[in-house]
Every structure is written in structure tokens, then in C-alpha cells.
Design a protein with these regions (language model features):
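Conserved alpha/beta core of the MobA/IspD/sugar-nucleotide pyrophosphorylase nucleotidyltransferase superfamily
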Residues: 91-167
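Short secondary-structure boundary/capping segments
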Residues: 25-26, 54, 82-83, 132, ...
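Residues at secondary-structure transition points
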Residues: 8-12, 16, 120-127
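Short, small-residue-biased leader/transition segments that mark boundaries at the very start
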Residues: 1-5
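Short, flexible turn/loop "capping" segments at secondary-structure junctions
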Residues: 33-34, 84-88, 142
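Short, hinge-like loop/turn segments at secondary-structure boundaries
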Residues: 20-21, 53, 78-84, 159-161
Length: 167
């Protein structure tokens, strides 16, 4: 899987990983569930993994997520608030993002085939669920995540991550 880590976009790495799995494993092994997880989320719990596995078996596509606590604003291109979505309908998506292998593989194959036209269509892929949402008719289930499953990406994240790791 060495080449998987040398891609420009995250989705390129995931696609390379999916192709490597499909090529390296017997066919029956690619008929199961695949977890796609962000290495910047080191505190994922067994409970989240189990819930995602159960929901992926039931719905074929799910992502760990938590309801947002803050009000969210959608901004225009000049940084002015344009609209405010209903907070009770807005979720913060985490990883793992979990899918039946065939569904996520086929969605990524469509992405790969149309990759050159994404920018002109105004599409910026930000996660694996978006690949499924954009290139299939399949819905993605939001599965209960945890506020402790934080993404550690900036120095400001470290004290909270350390606190969680100590507890």
C-alpha cells in the first residue's frame, strides 16, 4: 500500500486504498464492510466502531457524527451571513465512515471517472460520505459518534486531547 500515501487529495488516497484492497483480497473478502478512518482522530472508541459496524450492515453506509452545539451560519463569498440552518438538523461528521465495500468502491469509481469535471461543476469532495451522496442515489446514515472523538489538527487541540487520554 506504499503508493496510497503519496496522493494529493484525501479522496485519491482512499481510492488507491480501495483498489489495493480489491486487488489483494479474494472476492468474498471485498463483499464485507470497510471502515475509512482519519488518523487525526486517535480517540475513537470501541462503542463508535460497533455502532458504525451495525449501521453499515443495516444501511450499507454510515458516518460517525454528533449534533452541533453552536449555531451555524452559511456565508456568502464576502464573509457575510447569508442563512442560518436549523441547528437541530445540523451534524458534525467524524470518522470512521463505514460502507459496504461494493457501494463505496463503485462510488469512488464514478468519482475517478468524473474527477476532471468536479471543479467546473463546483464540487469539492470533503469526505467519503460525500462521494456516496454525489455519485450514487444511496443515503448515508448518521451514526452516534462522540464529542471525545475529536480531530487533532492544531496545537489548540492538544490540551483537550491530552485531557481525554488521561481520563
Amino acid at each position: 500500500l506504499g503508493d496510497v500515501y503519496k496522493r494529493q487529495e484525501r479522496y485519491d488516497s482512499v481510492w488507491m486504498g480501495l483498489k489495493a484492497v480489491k486487488g489483494d483480497l479474494p472476492k468474498e473478502a471485498t463483499e464485507g464492510i470497510v471502515f475509512i478512518h482519519d488518523g487525526a482522530r486517535p480517540m475513537v472508541s470501541e462503542d463508535i466502531l460497533e455502532r458504525c459496524f451495525q449501521d453499515a450492515q443495516k444501511y450499507n453506509a454510515c458516518v460517525a457524527a454528533v449534533p452541533v452545539k453552536d449555531t451555524i451560519k452559511i456565508a456568502d463569498e464576502n464573509g457575510f451571513a447569508e442563512t442560518t440552518p436549523r441547528r437541530d438538523r445540523v451534524w458534525q461528521v467524524q470518522t470512521p465512515q463505514t460502507f459496504s465495500f461494493g457501494l463505496i468502491y463503485d462510488a469512488y469509481a464514478q468519482l475517478a471517472a468524473q474527477k476532471d469535471t468536479l471543479a467546473e461543476k463546483g464540487i469539492k469532495i470533503t469526505d467519503d460520505a460525500m462521494v456516496v451522496e454525489t455519485f450514487t442515489d444511496h443515503q448515508v446514515k448518521l451514526t452516534e459518534g462522540s464529542y471525545r472523538n475529536l480531530k487533532v489538527t492544531t496545537p489548540e487541540d492538544l490540551p483537550l486531547a491530552e485531557k481525554y487520554l488521561r481520563s
